[in-house]
Amino acid sequence: MAAASSRSFSLCVLLLLLLLAPPISASFLFDGGKSKSAAAAAAVDMEWRPATATWYGDAEGDGSTGGACGYGSLVDVVPMKARVGSVSPVLFKDGEGCGACYKVKCLDHGICSRRAVTVIVTDECPGGLCAFGRTHFDLSGAAFSRMAVAGAGGHLRDRGQLSVVYRRTACKYGGKNIAFRVNEGSTNFWLSLLVEFEDGQGDIGSMQIKQANSVEWLDMKHVWGATWCLVRGPLVGPFSVRLTTLSAQKALTARDVIPRNWKPTATYTSRLNFEAAL
């Protein structure tokens, strides 16, 4: 988790240097040359699609600790506990797919349950079965086992790799509101935030903040995973934060959610969330 925070801070500093060098476009660097409007889908795809799935970690384990999205220890506790998934780049979307929720189910009716398991994107699997444009889920042992009929989890895990179908589903965090973690290394000139517990679509396409006594919304840059960064200053709190989803451009504003006396590594919880629907 400390390494993730250090990486976020380093990337924010790099962004500052790029902003001071006009010939280089910082947005091109972090967006891979794609505009946000081009990357965002007009609607959420609700159809079942084919994919493959494997599992990792302990047989009934929760999956990875942390992961490429930067959620850290959140993946080890409810509501993420045992529901985490590592996905191939086509679903990870350079980190913009972090927080999205999917239903996944296997197809062999002799061993597979008819119900689907719900997983949350918390990590990326970049190689092997996840490479070359494939759609792949590398699930925690617990999530993988839940696709089996009662008592057959061990037999399903023995197969190792499965053909599955998947589709997007609404994220539901059981009454939790959206929270913002101020990443380690943040200052009044380098502010880095990680977004947690977004109901509904779960993915974030853009993020803006507004300072105290200001009417101007400042665009934050997507750095990696679920982390966003603003290089400007001095910044004066309290900060309001506006989120827009990647998939369907739904917006939400958390007013004065980060206080004037904010601290690095602290988490600040809003009083609202997106509707728990797609």
From Swiss-Prot:
Q: Which InterPro entries match?
A: Expan_Lol_pI, Expansin/allergen_DPBB_dom, Expansin_CBD, Expansin_CBD_sf, LolPI, RlpA-like_DPBB, RlpA-like_sf
List residues of the Expansin-like CBD domain.
Answer: 189-270
Q: How does it sit in the membrane?
A: Peripheral membrane protein
Using the record's annotation, list all stretches that form the Expansin-like EG45 domain.
66-176
Q: Which Pfam families does this entry report, sorted A to Z?
A: DPBB_1, Expansin_C
Main localization of the protein described in the UniProt heading: secreted
| Gene Ontology biological-process annotations | plant-type cell wall loosening; sexual reproduction; syncytium formation
- Superkingdom, according to UniProt? Eukaryota
**Signal peptide (from-to):** 1-26
Q: Name one GO cellular component term.
A: membrane
Q: Give all cystine bridges in this chain.
A: 69-98, 101-171, 106-112
* Cross-referenced CDD domains: DPBB_EXPB_N
Keyword annotations for this protein, in alphabetical order, are: Cell wall, Cell wall biogenesis/degradation, Disulfide bond, Membrane, Secreted, Signal
Gene3D superfamilies reported in the protein's UniProt record: Expansin, cellulose-binding-like domain, RlpA-like domain
Subcellular location per the Swiss-Prot or TrEMBL entry: Secreted, Cell wall; Membrane
Please list every transmembrane segment annotated in the UniProt record, as residue ranges.
none
Q: Does the keyword Signal apply?
A: yes
Q: Which family does it belong to?
A: Belongs to the expansin family. Expansin B subfamily.
Primary role: May cause loosening and extension of plant cell walls by disrupting non-covalent bonding between cellulose microfibrils and matrix glucans. No enzymatic activity has been found. May be required for rapid internodal elongation in deepwater rice during submergence.
> Would you tell me the protein name for this molecule?
Expansin-B17
Organism of derivation: Oryza sativa subsp. japonica
Q: Which gene encodes it?
A: EXPB17
